[in-house]
């Protein structure tokens, strides 16, 4: 799309985007994965990597469905930031461990990684795990329903969707974007209900019954 171009092996956001426009998405949808990428922001820059984004006409912008790994130049950002808006957060949901964050200066490359493994989520920054949480738990829903996403009923519910980079009005560069898809884990099923032999069929002449 117009705000994006390729220069010297990097995807670059020109900085022409806004909250309502300026996104680029993958053709393919992903479910469980390890996603890593290098990124570099302009001074005071703001961007993000979103996943499980649902593309439907009723969703005007990607972030009303897709969680976001926030990318931002905190020291030079022109406005005060809430904790849930800062670098490495699961935007407006979960906060990273600041003691584990080692950020290269603005204008230099940093590396980030998202792991989404059957609802277990990790955020990494420059080789350090800075955040992990479980999606769709009671705590997750409490955060969703009491904060920024209270009026975004479909936020974070999709288990599969496209990846999305954000041009939020600041030039940004991305390279070495790599993904490894992870297997879907089968849900454990209880084969005996403890009450009767439903789901079982007698084989042979023996009599089977339920006791205790």
Which positions does each model-derived feature cover?
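Carbohydrate-interacting regions of secretory-pathway proteins
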Residues: 1-212
């Amino acid at each position: 799309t117009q705000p994006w171009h390729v220069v010297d092996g990097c995807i670059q956001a020109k900085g022409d985007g806004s909250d309502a426009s300026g996104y680029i998405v993958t053709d393919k949808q992903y479910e469980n994965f390890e996603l890593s990428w290098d990124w570099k922001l302009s001074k005071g820059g703001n961007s993000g990597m979103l996943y499980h984004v649902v593309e439907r006409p009723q969703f005007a912008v990607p972030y009303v469905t897709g969680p976001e790994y926030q990318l931002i130049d905190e020291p030079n950002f022109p406005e005060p930031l809430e904790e849930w808006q800062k670098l490495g957060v699961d935007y407006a949901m979960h906060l990273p461990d600041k003691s584990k964050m080692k950020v290269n200066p603005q204008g230099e490359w940093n590396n980030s990684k998202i792991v989404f493994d059957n609802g277990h989520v990790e955020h990494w920054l420059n080789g350090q795990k800075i955040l992990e949480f479980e999606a769709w738990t009671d705590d997750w829903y409490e955060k969703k329903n009491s904060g920024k996403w209270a009026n975004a009923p479909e936020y974070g519910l999709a288990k599969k969707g496209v990846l999305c980079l954000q041009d939020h009005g600041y030039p940004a560069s991305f390279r070495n974007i790599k993904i490894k898809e992870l297997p879907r884990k089968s849900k454990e099923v209880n084969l005996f209900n403890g009450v009767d032999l439903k789901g079982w069929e007698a084989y042979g002449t023996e009599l089977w019954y339920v006791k205790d």
